Amino acid sequence: MPSLPMTTRVSAYPSYILNMLALAGICVSLLVAFFFQLVLGEIPCPLCMLQRVGLMLVGLGFAMNVRFGPSATHYAIIILSAITGAGVSLRQVLLHIAPGDTGFGSAIFGYHMYTWGFIAFMATIIFSAFMLMVDRKHMAGSNQIIQTALGSVLIGFFLLLSLGNLTSDVLTCGLA
């Protein structure tokens, strides 16, 4: 009795791992933002909040890739969200590029968080475009989904962080 080939499942596994690592990177970014806000007392400015929303939307695309498998639609969500986040980050970088301007908030390794945000969004665009090219064979008709407990926990943690960020924004700005 012939068995079903497992090449799709096995060859899709590196993509699954890379998408999980990208989602973990988004979670770390949101945690660092929370640390600066809650522990160091640096209240985020409106542009910072928009960058966090961009991060959450990028994370949503990666979470969908982890949960449902790689998809061109998921990568499009990631790329469009990262372009928007990069635009907001670049706007903030350009606001503080004047001579003598010390920037907004604390610096991490010499760069402010909005500069790191721009770098991260641009890296996300490049990574997602590369994955979109590499994952084409897995997107065409592959309906096998790799789901692990670690992936589910990571998605849950991301959703919890996103809810925390949205709650923080509502408490900071109000609903109106």
Model-derived segments and spans:
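Secretory/periplasmic and organellar redox-cofactor proteins
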Residues: 1-43, 55-58, 70-176
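Short cysteine clusters
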Residues: 45-48
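Regulatory, intrinsically disordered low-complexity regions in eukaryotic nuclear proteins
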Residues: 51-52
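Short cysteine/histidine-rich metal-coordination sites, predominantly Zn2+-binding motifs
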Residues: 61-68
